[in-house]
Swiss-Prot record:
Region named Required for interaction with NOP7: 264-382
Upper taxonomic lineage: Eukaryota, Fungi, Dikarya, Ascomycota, Saccharomycotina
Subunit text: Component of the NOP7 complex, composed of ERB1, NOP7 and YTM1. The complex is held together by ERB1, which interacts with NOP7 via its N-terminal domain and with YTM1 via a high-affinity interaction between the seven-bladed beta-propeller domains of the 2 proteins. The NOP7 complex associates with the 66S pre-ribosome.
Repeat region (WD), residues: 434-473, 482-522, 590-632, 635-673, 676-715, 719-758, 775-805
Listed name of the protein: Ribosome biogenesis protein ERB1
């Protein structure tokens, strides 16, 4: 048996040689196959050498196999032969489509052929020091260079190779030619291969060629390195010198000196929005905190639910998105079967209703009268109304409006009754008539006996308060010669021992001592006025030290020159003429522009005037004892409307169109700037205690400012329908008033507390009516009696009125 086996193997070797020789002959004889350039001489020599080495290896293997086979038993050999016969029977193909000669020739050619890969030669050179240098082949950076995208030679796709088991080929190449199956070894050879594993054996078949898939030494070495977790690239040095990027030494100086961004320490607005959403959900009950949820669960567990079987069903809480349908309105008298006669339409109304379109009708039925309820027919519009209601319910959007159950009385502040706040003026007791023009201004002397009024007819009249009798009159303006001059302001000197009356007429200011007081008072007043002529400097007066906004100077040199410059004459003090002396005028002050407002200091030596058209000299401070006029402002701060002194501090309140500025005259600085928020202010007045201010505006508002609080108004009163002309405080009582062009005077109670924590209490008391509106002008000026709760008003109806309790 052993000899027979050896003879069989020898026959196989000779057959393999014959097949190789036949393939060479056929390749030379067949002109169809073009193999030029594919195999060169060197490759052939290498193939011959590989073939000879393969023969030597085969003979050596045969000798080894012979030695091993001698030790095998006869039964094992019979078993192997049986398997070989079985394999041969399985390898029969269905060759109905192919000729027997072709199949035999192809199988003979392919059997025994060993495919080997020709490795590219490695070119070695030397470095300058003589060491060998390996030059690796240059990688061609094309799409085929990526191993994962290598084009497959066998283009069968995902079709398994088992489909081609009964065919001589295993697939097709790119050109559509068959890829023939390589020669198979016998079952005995396969068994021997599994016992003695050849070099690079894997036990796998190549899908493209169908031959066994072996791995090279380099690949095997690479796999072993990966298993041992070693470096796969020899050019990489794992023990390179360490570069200590992050040292153990602490760095003192920062890597970056950039300032911290603001977002690092400012709360995030986005987080605040998210938190507010969560807070809102918690307040609405959509989110229950864990503690509360735990308490509710414990409460549910502890509660004993005893259900009343015979009770009404409990109402379940509706979902938050569930809105109940609105209820239908209750029926009215028109829908009654026996409505009153006034609800029954006439024939004309019925015809008009029938001619009106359905969508424009006020109601869908015509009221009718029936004797009894059983005679009422069916309602024809019931189906239509139900259908339209259904459309409204599911098409029209709805929203839930939470009604606030608030007592209306709780919204009204608790104010004392006006009866408890008496006395205050409630009626007109005296009317002072006699002027032929509008009475623009009035003033009452410190004694409270005499009332002075100035009118557009150019006259100033003095009235006795109690009797309403005119005791003095002086004509200061001749309307024929000076039709544009008007009397804008009349003010008594607060010093009752002098009896001086200041009258602003056009560009002039007249100081009058009317002969109504007696010799002592009249003489004291004239002496006070004449005493100032001893201080006359005849135009050589240097610039005064009173400069409230001295910081407005452009440079230090200009300030130094200003200290030595001669003062410009902003106003001139003149002795009266003979005619003026006959009118009891003691002195005349001539200004550059018309004087609109005049206000005295509490001591009676200074008074301030306002000339809105005079620019930086709009505000002038006049000193009676020295006949001196000063302009405290170097630059104008808008159009000045009014100016007044503080009741007891050296401060000046200047009112422009939009702002009220408070200046300290002793320190010559701006103390505060009030922002009333009105478009055009008209008048201001200061509380006798000096910590509150009221301002009136032409946009129908009265503004109360608390000087101890913010610069914005504490209260804004909107009771008037037209421009507010005047607002005044009472000097002794907690009262103030406001007068407007609508002809009304509003009386208010104003209590200012000593406690700084309490805000002033403002209570409206009375609305006085009596003045007539002429030429869109109503009440032009008001003033309080110095002692009593009496109010005096001047109107555009040529009258002045006294309002008493």
């Amino acid at each position: 048996m052993v000899k027979g086996r050896k003879s069989q193997k020898a026959d196989k070797v000779t057959k393999a040689k014959k097949r190789v020789a036949d393939e060479v002959d056929e390749s030379e004889s067949e002109p169809e196959l073009q193999v030029e350039g594919l195999i060169d001489a060197e490759a052939e020599s290498e193939d011959d050498e590989s073939f000879e080495s393969a023969e030597e290896n085969a003979s050596a293997e045969e000798d080894e196999e012979d030695e091993e086979d001698e030790e095998d038993s006869d039964a094992e050999l019979n078993k192997l032969l049986a398997e070989e016969e079985g394999d041969d029977s399985e390898s029969e193909y269905n060759t109905s489509d192919f000729s027997e000669d072709d199949t035999k020739s192809m199988t003979d050619k392919l059997s025994g052929v060993k495919l080997t890969t020709i490795a590219e030669p490695i070119i070695k050179t030397k470095f300058s020091d003589g060491t060998p240098r390996v030059i690796k082949p240059e990688i061609n950076p094309v799409y085929d260079s990526d191993d994962s995208d290598i084009e497959s030679k066998n283009t069968i796709g995902n079709i398994p190779l088992s489909v081609y088991d009964e065919m001589p080929h295993i697939g097709y190449d790119v050109n559509g030619k068959r890829i023939m199956r390589p020669a198979r070894a016998s079952a005995l050879d396969q068994l021997l291969d599994t016992i003695e594993l050849p070099e690079g054996w894997t036990g796998l078949l190549d899908k493209e060629s169908g031959a066994s898939l072996n791995i090279s030494k380099e690949e095997l070495e690479l796999i072993s390195k990966i298993q041992r977790n070693e470096q796969t690239d020899e050019s990489t040095n794992p023990y390179e010198p360490l570069i200590d990027w992050f040292t153990r030494h602490e760095e003192v100086m920062p890597l970056s000196a950039a300032p911290e961004p603001k977002r690092r320490f400012v709360p995030s607005k986005n987080e605040a929005k998210r938190i507010m959403k969560i807070v809102k959900a918690i307040r609405e009950g959509r989110i229950i905190p864990p503690k509360k949820m735990k308490e509710l669960r414990e409460k549910e567990k502890s509660e004993d639910f005893n259900y009343d079987l015979w009770g009404d069903s409990t109402e379940t809480n509706d979902h938050i998105m569930n809105l109940r349908a609105p209820k239908l309105p209750p029926p009215t008298n028109e829908e009654s079967y026996n409505p009153p006669a006034e609800y029954l339409p006439t024939e004309e109304e019925i015809k008009e209703w029938e001619n009106t379109e359905y969508s424009e009708r006020e109601r869908n039925f015509v009221p009718k009268k029936y004797d009894s309820l059983r005679k009422v027919p069916g309602y024809t519009e019931s189906v239509r109304e139900r259908f339209e209601r259904s459309l409204d319910l599911y098409l029209a959007p709805r929203m839930r409006k939470n009604k606030l159950n608030i007592d209306p009385e709780s919204l009204i502040p608790e104010l004392p009754s006006p009866k408890d706040l008496r006395p205050f003026p409630i009626r007109c007791s005296t009317i002072y008539s006699g002027h032929e023009g509008k009475i623009r201004t009035l003033s009452i002397d410190p004694t409270g006996i005499w009332l002075a009024t100035g009118s557009d007819d150019g006259s100033v009249r003095i009235w006795e308060i109690l009797t309403g009798r005119e005791v003095y009159r002086v004509q200061l303006v001749n309307k024929e010669d000076n039709p544009e001059d008007n009397i804008h302001s009349v003010e008594w000197n607060p010093d009752g021992s002098v009896g001086i009356l200041a009258v602003a007429v056009g560009n002039n200011i007249f100081l009058i001592v009317p002969p109504i007081f007696g010799y002592d008072i009249e003489n004291a007043g004239k002496v006070r006025i004449e005493h100032g002529f001893g201080y006359d400097t005849f135009g050589s007066t240097k610039k005064a030290n009173l400069e409230v906004n001295g910081s407005d100077l452009e440079s230090d040199d200009e300030a130094a020159n200003a200290n030595t410059a001669v003062k410009k004459q902003v106003a001139q003090w003149h002795k009266p003429t003979q005619r003026q002396m006959e009118q009891d005028i003691c002195i005349v002050i001539v200004c550059k522009k018309p004087v609109k407002k005049l206000s005295w200091h509490r001591k009676g030596d200074y008074f301030v005037t306002v000339q809105p058209d005079s620019g930086n000299t709009s505000v002038l401070i006049h000193q009676l004892s020295k006949h001196l006029t000063q302009s405290p402002f170097r630059k104008s701060k808008g159009i000045i409307m009014d100016a007044k002194f503080h009741p007891f501090k050296p401060q000046l309140f200047v009112c422009s169109q939009r702002y009220v500025r408070i200046y300290d005259l002793s320190q010559q600085v701006l103390v505060k700037k009030l922002l009333p928020g009105a478009r055009w202010l008209s008048n201001i007045d200061i509380h006798p205690r000096g910590d509150n201010l009221i301002a009136s505006s032409y946009d129908k508002r009265v503004l109360w400012h608390d000087l101890d609080l913010a610069a914005t108004p504490y209260k804004t009163l909107r009771y008037h329908d037209k421009a507010v002309r005047s607002t005044t405080f009472h000097k002794k009582l907690p009262l103030f008033c406001s007068a407007a062009d609508d002809g009304f005077i509003h009386i208010f109670h104003a209590t200012v507390y000593d406690d700084m924590m309490k805000n002033p209490m403002i209570v409206p008391l009375k609305k006085l009516t009596g003045h007539k509106v002429q030429g869109h002008l109503g009440v032009l000026d008001t003033i309080w009696h110095p002692k009593e709760a009496w109010l005096f008003s001047a109107g555009a109806d040529n009258t002045a009125r006294m309002w008493t309790t």
